[in-house]
Amino acid sequence: MNVEHEIKLLIDEIKRLGVENSENKTWTVKYGVLFSDDKCANIFEALVGTLRAAKKRKIVKFDGEILLQGVHDQVDIVLLKDTL
């Protein structure tokens, strides 16, 4: 799977699992929700790598450079735009 395709899938999963903020048209999901979701586990070989690639392209934002299960479960992943 290529990076762009995985980012598109990530966008879909953030919308499926997250909450929309109608004020600024963003979606937010907790890292722990994404990480522990069975569908996401089956889609993404390296969720953190996909998140970092999306962050580099300014599609998502989150605090920190790398996210770890358990330690960062409550970190918000914010979808800034839903297109590449």
Give, region by region, the residue ranges found by the protein language model:
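Eukaryotic low-complexity, proline/serine- and acidic-rich intrinsically disordered regions
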Residues: M1-I7, A53, V60-E65, D76
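Generic structural hydrophobic/aromatic packing signal, biased to beta-strands
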Residues: L10, I14, V29-Y31, A54, ...
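Short, cationic-aromatic polyanion-contact patches
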Residues: I66-L84
